[in-house]
């Protein structure tokens, strides 16, 4: 199974890239993690609908057919660590690859959010996109560690 993290925005600070890579390399071979960063649409005088459409096209192009889509959204379901671990286990048993999608500065296109198989949120707080990448990969690793009985997660 593969976890594909699709993130709008190609530039992140070095500290965020280093932290992301540190967690990504911890996953076992049977649970591959891949990051696909897609270009943010230049803002200028474009309408929000135009921006959403351009970023949605890039996101959809980055996600292979048959992949389960999970949109990160402030209106999504809030999960505990145990609930995310259970969700990860379900995804693994289902056998499909999963794409977790992080939107751009204005979030995700409303139609894309609605079409996603699931919508989850990481926090009630507004977070910088670089931080979301790190928080997401860390929480996925923590969920894996719960399921594997690895000592990383402590109650």
Curated annotation (Swiss-Prot):
Metal-binding in keyword set: no
Molecular functions per Gene Ontology: rRNA (pseudouridine-N3-)-methyltransferase activity
Domain of life of the organism encoding this protein: Bacteria
Catalysed transformations (reactions): pseudouridine(1915) in 23S rRNA + S-adenosyl-L-methionine = N(3)-methylpseudouridine(1915) in 23S rRNA + S-adenosyl-L-homocysteine + H(+)
Pfam families to which the protein is assigned, alphabetical: SPOUT_MTase (PF02590)
Binding site for S-adenosyl-L-methionine: 72, 103, 122-127
Entry keywords, A to Z: Cytoplasm, Methyltransferase, rRNA processing, S-adenosyl-L-methionine, Transferase
Signal peptide start-end: none
GO cellular component: cytoplasm
Subunit: Homodimer.
Function: Specifically methylates the pseudouridine at position 1915 (m3Psi1915) in 23S rRNA.
Entry's family note: Belongs to the RNA methyltransferase RlmH family.
The protein's name in its UniProt record: Ribosomal RNA large subunit methyltransferase H
Species this chain originates from: Paracidovorax citrulli (strain AAC00-1) (Acidovorax citrulli)
